[in-house]
Amino acid sequence: MQIKQIEGSLSAKDIRFALVVSRFNDFIGQKLVEGAIDCILRHGGSEEQITVYRCPGAFELPMVAKKVAMSGSADAVIALGVIIRGSTPHFDVIAAEATKGIAQVSLDTMIPVSFGVLTTENLEQAIERAGTKAGNKGFDAAMTAMEMVNLYRQF
């Protein structure tokens, strides 16, 4: 007996992407956006398939992601942002709530919402993960989004 295996392909063809990005730490967030767009274009997508929504901070990402997901205008949402630890507990609260909120949007709407939010100890780590030493997490989040859409389409 052969076991059936189902997985999503890495093709952006015919997928409508919504990039929801936090403006806080925008110089890094913009690199994540560029990485996500690069990924989509390299995998057969076009600029016409991409809409970028900008919100004030990481805390607002789940709200905007849910609004977009519920609108029916996107097949996948890619949440992008940067949260850098400071000297107060603010980092822990925002990182936890943004993470939980983004996951909840995907569960509530059954629209793939990929997580491309950097949570780093310092600015150097954030820069590394936005296209230098550690790749680009925006690119990675776009890969996840397209794979999940293509997986969902097989049900």
Swiss-Prot record:
Its EC number is 2.5.1.78
Catalytic activity reads: (2S)-2-hydroxy-3-oxobutyl phosphate + 5-amino-6-(D-ribitylamino)uracil = 6,7-dimethyl-8-(1-D-ribityl)lumazine + phosphate + 2 H2O + H(+)
Keyword hit for Cell cycle: no
Family membership, please give it. Answer: Belongs to the DMRL synthase family.
Return the Pfam families for the record: DMRL_synthase
Question: Is Cell wall biogenesis/degradation tagged as a keyword?
Answer: no
Which pathway is recorded for this entry? Answer: Cofactor biosynthesis; riboflavin biosynthesis; riboflavin from 2-hydroxy-3-oxobutyl phosphate and 5-amino-6-(D-ribitylamino)uracil: step 1/2
Major enzyme class: transferase
> Keyword set for this entry?
Riboflavin biosynthesis, Transferase
| UniProt-listed GO biological process terms | riboflavin biosynthetic process
Q: What is this protein called?
A: 6,7-dimethyl-8-ribityllumazine synthase
User: Where do the annotations place (2S)-2-hydroxy-3-oxobutyl phosphate binding?
Assistant: 87-88, 129
* Positions of 5-amino-6-(D-ribitylamino)uracil binding: 24, 58-60, 82-84, 115
> Domain of life, per the record?
Bacteria
Alphabetically, the GO molecular function entries are:
6,7-dimethyl-8-ribityllumazine synthase activity
Gene3D superfamilies tied to this protein? Lumazine/riboflavin synthase
Sum up the protein's function in the record's words: Catalyzes the formation of 6,7-dimethyl-8-ribityllumazine by condensation of 5-amino-6-(D-ribitylamino)uracil with 3,4-dihydroxy-2-butanone 4-phosphate. This is the penultimate step in the biosynthesis of riboflavin.
Any one GO cellular component localisation term in the record: riboflavin synthase complex
Active site (UniProt): 90
